[in-house]
């Protein structure tokens, strides 16, 4: 049915009015047909998103209809040096797509390899009833780091990337503090990041069920965005894409994430050399402490025309608000 296009609020989807106007942030409003304008990456597998039947209850009305849900499958990450048998490193629950980036980003951000060690990839045997790309072998130029070869109990869930590590020592990747005097970014650029990231979230538009990580130039231009059911996976895919492009360290980039900031997000960003992390939601206390120690600028609650700077505020140019310059 035709009708006017109604923008519900900045950063939200546009809907076509069919009956009466209702606002909603979490699902298609009753009386509207969702219009998705951001195209999906053509490199994504069909399993990235799937269709399922739902019984939708809206007030006193119900409807049986198709709904789009995000894919979630295990990925077994293995690694092997020259003339070595692959070693199982981790199993992570992820949204299918960009498996090579995820594997390389994971190994790099966990401090297990350096980016220039990767020589190629092989498909692993995922076992019974798994998809062919549910296991990947990362081939390395030199023999395995002892940190990879030691026994591990490493199962990363979508919500907890560090769950199941063998010891507390495994949680803290040793990372040197970032150099001081890294880029200073304008307030206007910081304020633009959330809406730019949201506008590029093609899969979220269809499901409402994905986290996103975006890497930006210091002038606010989006370099790469990745979406995944796990926030740490989305970041690993971003980091992996830059490792494979031989761009690390990322000292002149900004990271924007769609949710909260945990210890692990700060750790992974710092390993990649990212000096500024921005988030729509709050950081944890451990994330703040780690960012402070590693010299990372941490920005939270980036919404509308405001944000909070938790650490190393010198990288955000606030002179106009202070009547200076």
Task: Pin down the residues of each PLM region.
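Feature captures the catalytic cores and cofactor-binding loops of soluble hydro-lyases/lyases
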Residues: 232-321
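Hydrophobic alpha-helical segments
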Residues: 119, 175-178, 183, 244, ...
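Amphipathic, positively biased hydrophobic alpha-helical segments used for protein targeting
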Residues: 14, 22, 116, 172-175, ...
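Phosphate/diphosphate-binding glycine-rich loops and adjacent basic-rich segments that engage nucleotide
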Residues: 160, 319-320, 324-325
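A mid-sequence, solvent-exposed acidic-amphipathic segment
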Residues: 194-258, 264-265
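Intrinsically disordered, low-complexity regions enriched in acidic/Ser/Thr/Pro/Gln residues
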Residues: 35-213, 217-225
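Intrinsically disordered, low-complexity regions
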Residues: 3-4, 12, 32, 60, ...
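N-terminal amphipathic/basic-hydrophobic helices that include classical n-h-c signal peptides
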Residues: 1-35
